[in-house]
Amino acid sequence: MQDISTTTASTNYLKADGDTGAVFSITSQQQQIHYMRKQKPDHEKTREELIEEINHLRAVSNSNKNARIMLDEMYQFVALLDVNGNLLDVNEPALQGGGMIRSSIQGIPFWDCRWWATSQENIDNVREAVHKASKGEFIRYETEIFGKSAGTEKITIDFSLMPLFNDKGEVSLILPEGRNITEKRLGELEIERKNNELRSLYEKIKELDELKTQFFANVSHELRTPLALIVGPTDKLLKDENVDINVRKDLEIVARNARGLLKIVNNLLDISRLEAGKMNLNYSMVNLGQTVHLIASCFEILAREKSLDFSIITPSEPMMAAIDADKMQRVITNLISNAFKFTPSGGAVKCILEKFDLSPNKPGFQIVVSDTGPGIPDNLHEIIFERFRQVDGSSTRKHGGTGLGLSIVKEFVTLHGGTVTIHNISTGGAQFTLRLPLTPNMDEHLYKKTISDQNISEIQQQLYQQQQQEQQQQQQQQQNLQQPKLILNNIDNKYKINDDDNDDDDDDDDEDGLNFNILKKTNTSSDIASNALKDNMGSIMGVHAIAQQAVEELTEKQFYQSQENIHNKPIVLVVEDNPEMNRFIAELLSKYYFVVTAFDGVEGIEKTRAITPDLIVTDCMMPRMSGDEMVEQLRSDEQFDNIPILLLTAKADENLRIKLLQNGVSDYVNKPFSSEELVARVVNLMTMKKAKQFLQEELSSANTDLQELINQLTNKKRDLQTLVGELEKERNLLNNTNKSKDEFFMNLSHELRTPLNGILGWCQLLLYDIDSGGSSGGGSGSISGDDSTVRTGLETIERCASSQNQLINDLLDMSLIIGDKFSLILGDVDLPILIENAISSILVTAQSKKISVHSNIQGEGEEESSILRNIVGDKARLQQVIWNLLSNSIKFTKEKGRIHLNLKVVNQIPSREVLGFCSNPMFNTINRHGDRWILFTITDNGKGIPKQFLPSVFDRFKQADCSSTRSYGGLGIGLSITQNIIHLHKGAVYANSEGENKGSQFTVVLPIIKGSSSSNSSPSNQLSCSSSPPLIKKPFFSQPTNYINNNNNNNNNNNNNNNNNNNNNNNNNNNNNYNNYNNNNSNNNNNSNNNNNNNNNNNNNNNNNNNNNNNNNNNLNINNLINNNHNNNNNNYHHNNNNNNNSNNNEKLGKRQREEINNNENNNVDLRLRTPPPPPTSSISENFLVNSSNLIPSPALNPINNNNNSNNNNNNIGDIKKINLEISQIPSTNLNPKLSLVINNNNNNNNNNNSLLKTIITNAINNNINNSNNDDNSNNTTIPTPPSSAINMINSLPLPSPSPSFILPTLSPFSSPLSELKSSSNNNNNNNNNSNNNNNNSMSPNLRSPKANSNKNLLGGIQIMLVDDLEETTHLFSSMLYKLGAKRIDTFQRVSDAYAFLCDSSKPQPDIILSDLTMPFEDGYSMVRKLRDREKINTQNKKTPIIALTASVSSSDKEKVLKSGFDLHCSKPVNFLELSNSILTLIEKYNTTVNIDLIKEQEQNNNNNNNNNNNNNNNNNNNNNNINNGNDDDSLLLTDSRPCKKANSQ
């Protein structure tokens, strides 16, 4: 008890001192207890004792600390338990592995800790182990615990519990330990798994080996049976003396090869038995000397044939041994035959038999066989005895064999307990040494299993007695020997077959099926030999048979002897190393061919070169050179490349066959083969050879003839080359001519257009003066506007010049077609609009000839109409096609004729509608462009086309009447151009006529390709001002804002959206939008708007409301044309006439936006306003009426449902945000292109302020329809229907030209007022009737002259620079541009002068530059290049727009112009109105600004001037559509958001 308490106190002390409360060293603890027992009380201790005690305690404390450090650093698990199993302490690695804290587990049972929580079984095992350890038992076992990753992973430990005893031998503490053996355990498991796999694989291999052995045994047995049936009958026939000698030779070959095959089968069977461990030995007493002599005697003849020195050395006395005679005979025979095989002629072979003691107590013998052959390399001495191993295993080895002979020798010798070795002789050759015991060793385990004789001990005793007797006989020198007795178990006869072996021993027989027996010695050795020859012939014959077969294999066979080829048979070369196979093949083929033989590849090549055979039959594996090597070498020689080769191979390898065929082998035959197969293949190859040879001879003969032809062709080729050279010169000349022609056309265009420019320009200028009532030059030479003769003359000049310009354009188009340079620029096309515009362009000419034009072009149904209005094509070229066809119909139709136009969509082209001659014979309606088509047909009842001329109607320059008396002019290129345009659209044109004076019909067929966008054309910006037949662009309005439904009402259009509130300070906005299309005989439009308000701001559309102190803004929205036979428009206007009224008539378009850009082939911008054509469904003839009050647009512009009833439309129209303007070419005589709607408003004391007009009026009406008697209730009654009214209206319609046009970007006139066209006001007195009746009834595509009244101030405030080398051109341009309102024009005839002016900062800089391209010294390109370079260098300079003036119209030239830096391209002759609009557009584009304050001031002045002109008491309607009303108002309107610059008036 004292010890325990002491131990506890010591433990507590250690806890306090060590901070860990653990006891680490049991030894130090016990020493401390023992030390404390011997201590005195402290008061009895001396100073030295106290110091000693303190030092001792310090040492113990340090020891405990060191122990703690060592335990915590240990990798293994260590703890300390009391005898009850409670945990006292544990090292740090154990705590970390279990994820526990020391303080939480101290004092608890050890098995309740986290480590053992893997399973309840584990906890129970630990509890049981602790219980056993507390009784003093050491416990150790492997277990799994939670010991890794803070107690989350299991590990395997080698766990032990060691009890610790006190001095009394009692267990005081328990020490648990654990070593992590997880990896070791995993390794053991992996090793166990691998071992199991290896065990399984071994068993599998063992099983496969057994199966293989069994297979060899079965195959050997199966082979031996047919071989026995071959050998037996063959031997029987050979014994027959009546057999023919040739047959006997064949039978001998069969017997010989059968025995050889039997030997191979026996060897394979022996190998299988050896592998299976089932090879048994049949021991018998054998006289070794006699056996060796018998075997050697078989080789004596062979030795003489090969001139070999063959010697046999044996002991003089008999040497008896207990061996397996059969196997030993095979061993000796194999060694001797190998020596003969590898020893060359003249060499030596020696066989020595002698006694050799294997050990002092073990007598034996050795047989040494040596030769003088090549020997065996030292590195092969060990492996030469392996199975299938050969010194030379290649396909070119000289000696054959399977490689089993030496392997079987070693196996048989080893079974006898002997050894076989090999070494090379210093003089050359190899030496094999066999060493075997005379008697078998029964103590060895090997022979217990393999020896079959159970009485071998008796044989040993007999052999000993025999040796003793022989020694005695030698001493006595007796001549006769006593024969020993036979002692055999279970044998009664003297010579009996030993049946003591197993059943498998039957397979150990030799090739002849004989067994050797052990004889009991009763006589002398000589008697044994004689009796063996007499009584046991089987054994002796067996030895002789084995040796004789080996000799036969080595004996050279008889070769085939070739005879003389007296019959000139085809030669066959047979290359085969086996003499018998060589001879067999040669004799087989000699019946048909002359055969020559060779025995290896080298000899085969030599004989091939000597005789050049017709066919080669060769083996694959031969000595010196294999068959495939021989083939490869022959094929590399062109001389023998055509010789067919038949290859014989014993390898059934598919890859080898493919390789041989690739290397040039003609055919191959697998061994074994039948004679019929071999002959058939040889005959086939020989037949093919003969056929090939015959064809080659024929070819050679033909080559002779061909050579003559070649010579002739060579001469002709030489002549052709000469002609080709001349043609090349002609071609170059033609190319130069074409180039010169193109240059000529360009120069011609320039030279012709330059004078035309002057003619047309001055015509425009003079007509401008006539319209304005002024003069061209001022002074006395004034031209009166009333002089109709002068006007007629000028218009005639203008018309003729325009016709000349169109002729130039047609010729240039034809030049492009001929040069294959004609192309299209595709975009969205609205076909009905194109047709309507074309009809409008020919309307005057049709009326002059009283021709009625009917059309049906809108399509049936909404879907078809949508398709027709959105197809893909070249708009400009399609317009040209329509205009050409329509103008031809007008030309060739007599007066009062009829023309009908029809447009529709079809799924299939009906043959009844598409008649006549097709312009494209290859045209096919079933193609990849789609299954829907557009048919456009123009039918007339005119002159017609003669039947004989119909096929030539589309030929260029062809005309039906080419005589000098023809009635119709033209060049005959219009229809040719038409067909080329349609062909480029993948369509066709059909021309049909029943004959002369029976009318004609032209049908255009186009595939439908729907459009995807509104602008698919080239982005180039080019302006074309040239005149040509009408090119119709898209309508002015791309979409309507309001869709108007026409209902059946009483023909009243009440468009009053007015809130009339009779209160002060009210705003009454009356917005009346006239967008009505009336197709009725009579329409009464009554518009009554009476608004009387004080201090009100009334915005009334089409209403003149004059109130006291009112500001009336009358916003006119006029977008309409009426095509009615009789239209009665009653407009009741209630005018309150007061002084000082300020009427602002602002004409607005409503919520319509024009945002489309129409791109044509040459991308010219058409900024000219155009009035849509009349409705296509009406008859455009003499019944064409116009009323100026209500102008109704074409259905193409506004999709209105026409129910042939009156319209009741209530529409609220807003302000326009964008309008796109277009520039195109205007035919002159048909048109009076007024760009403003002039309505005569005659009011008394009214100020008409028409400023800030944010609109573009789409109708140009140049006639004031008689509106007399305008009272307060003004009634614009129905206008009579004189043709002059219609003609005057049509004359005001500006028509575009079909010439290609470049398109400008979208222009917004309300974003910048420079794009807004100005209108002029005609202020007249009461009851004035102003009718400008310009009746031009002839069709002529002329450029129209600008009208003075409407365009006087069109270019107000613009400064222009003009560069042209011709003085008359600069004079013309400056004169006309000044009249159009230009502020300043600086003209230069050289680029250098113009550029110097631009660089002078003191000079006024132009707003725009007009430059000719063709000028001396420096051209227009130099001008634009200098200008753009200057702008790039000095970015502060504003960019100045520049327009190119050129007479060239080719696409390449136009593209070059735009790429060079020009902004637009204007072709000569110039339409000055369009040029002016282009100038305004470009200035707007470059953000040119004008002082808006000045504009407002000038507008106020203009209003005052207008008030002074209206001093009558009558009610007149003055609707002025001009931005600037006054004489000198040249300012330009801008939006309020832009900066302003003041523009001085000219």
UniProtKB/Swiss-Prot annotation:
Annotated EC: 2.7.13.3
Gene Ontology biological process terms, A to Z: sorocarp morphogenesis; sorocarp spore cell differentiation; sorocarp stalk cell differentiation
A matching Pfam family: HisKA
Compositional bias of kind Low complexity: 1013-1031, 1042-1146, 1313-1346, 1501-1526
Domain PAC: residue ranges: 139-193
Modified residues (Phosphohistidine): H221, H750
Stretches assigned to the Response regulatory domain: 571-686, 1359-1483
UniProt-annotated stretches for the region Disordered: 1013-1148, 1266-1285, 1313-1350, 1500-1546
Coiled-coil regions listed: 36-63
Ranges of residues in domain Histidine kinase: 218-440, 747-1010
Modification sites for 4-aspartylphosphate: D619, D1412
UniProt enzyme class: transferase
Superkingdom classification of source: Eukaryota
Domain PAS: 65-131
Keyword 4Fe-4S: no
Catalyzed chemical reaction(s): ATP + protein L-histidine = ADP + protein N-phospho-L-histidine
Alphabetized InterPro entries for the sequence: CheY-like_superfamily, HATPase_C_sf, His_kinase_dom, HisK_dim/P_dom, HisK_dim/P_sf, PAS, PAS-assoc_C, PAS-like_dom_sf
Alphabetized UniProt keyword annotations: ATP-binding, Coiled coil, Kinase, Nucleotide-binding, Phosphoprotein, Repeat, Transducer, Transferase, Two-component regulatory system
Molecular function via GO: ATP binding; phosphorelay sensor kinase activity
Function: Acts as a receptor histidine kinase for a signal transduction pathway. This protein undergoes an ATP-dependent autophosphorylation at a conserved histidine residue in the kinase core, and a phosphoryl group is then transferred to a conserved aspartate residue in the receiver domain.
Name under which the protein is recorded: Hybrid signal transduction histidine kinase D
